[in-house]
Structure formats: structure tokens, C-alpha cells
Amino acid sequence: MKKIISRYYLFIAILLVIADQFLIRLLLHSDLAAGLSDFAYYLSDMLLNFLVVLLAFIVMVWSGKWQKINSRKFKGSYLFYSFLALLAFVIWNFVTFYLFPPTKNEIAYQLDIPTFTGATAFLMYFFYPVVAGPIFEEMIYRGLVMTALEKGKKWGLDVLGSAALFGILHISNHGWVLTDFFVYMGGGLIFAVLFRVTKSIYWPI
């Protein structure tokens, strides 16, 4: 099994990205999810994402890729790179805020906020966007995607592929608006570069 995964790692990574970006949404927009409460709907979304991330983790471990990006070594330079990435991310958001209209993803979230109450509010105000979401995204779009594209590393394909897929992730459910894509791709590019220079999944998270 490990040899098969290593041999078809790129193909498996593509399938997992498709599952993360499209199959989950198909399930959540099917009749199966029609009768769910808000909390059950968002929890199902999170659990389905967790399942994809778990599969990605298993694939990375069995292929030997995880061992290469699992370094917990602390370096002052990594802390400095993280600070630069955070600064670049803040500047990017500031610039795009004035250059581009609000993204449809952001508008949809703002419209949903008043409906969040009780456990749903905790899930969608804090746990998912602050804790689970960043971990899920980095595991898939930095860990899985960039290790799958590492053969194109010298041409920057790992960074560009990760950033592009990260951008698509955030717009595919709300309409394909080019400015929205650039907003999210820019953020993905920053975290992809941070992952590249630190060689660790933990710093981007």
C-alpha cells in the first residue's frame, strides 16, 4: 500500500483536493443535508473537512512526505520569516481592501453572522475560523499540495499551485470573481512561501 501511495502520490493529492473543494459541497447541498439545523450543517462541514485532512495526513505519512515537513525545530530566522509573512499578509489585506470590492465569500459570511446563536456561534465565530480552519487549510494546501508538486519546485510550481488552489477554494462556492481570486491567492502565496522557507507545516499554521 505504501509503495502504491508513493507511486501515485500526485494523483491521490488531486483526488483529495477535488474532494475538499467540490465533493463536500455537493454533499452539503444535497437532499441529505436539507433538513439539518444550522449547527448540524456547519458541524457536518467541519467533520467532512476533517475526514479529508485525516486521509491527507495518512497519505503523507505512508509516502514519507510527512516526515519531511514535520520538523518542530525552532530557529530565530523562522520566527523572523513568520513575522514578515504576517506583516505581508496584513499589508496585502490593507491594499486589497482599498483596491478591490469586498469578496463574495466575506459578504456571505457577514450575512450569516446574525443567524449564529448558541453552539453555532462558538463553532463559526471561534473554533472553525480560528482553530480548525487554518489547520485544515495548511494541511491540504501547503502540506499535501506542495509536497505533491515538489518536483516542480525549481520553477515555483509548488508555491504557485498551492496559492492558486487556495484561491479557488475560497471563491468556488460563491461565484468565480477574478478580484476575489487574486485576494485569496495573494494570501495563499504568502503562506506557501513561508512553508517553503521553513520546511515545516507548523509555522504557516
PLM regions: where:
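Alpha-helical transmembrane segments
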Residues: S6-Q21, Y81-F89, V159-A163
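Alpha-helical transmembrane segments in multi-pass membrane proteins
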Residues: R7-S63
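Juxtamembrane helix-loop-helix connectors linking adjacent transmembrane helices
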Residues: A34-Y41, K65-G133
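Membrane-embedded alpha-helical segments of multi-pass membrane proteins
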Residues: L43-L55, A119, L123, F127, ...
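Structural signal for the C-terminal ends of transmembrane alpha-helices
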Residues: I58-K68, L194-V197
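Membrane-interface helix/loop boundary segments of multi-pass membrane proteins
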Residues: F136-G161, I190-W203
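Membrane-interface helix caps and helix-loop-helix hairpins in membrane proteins
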Residues: H170-L178
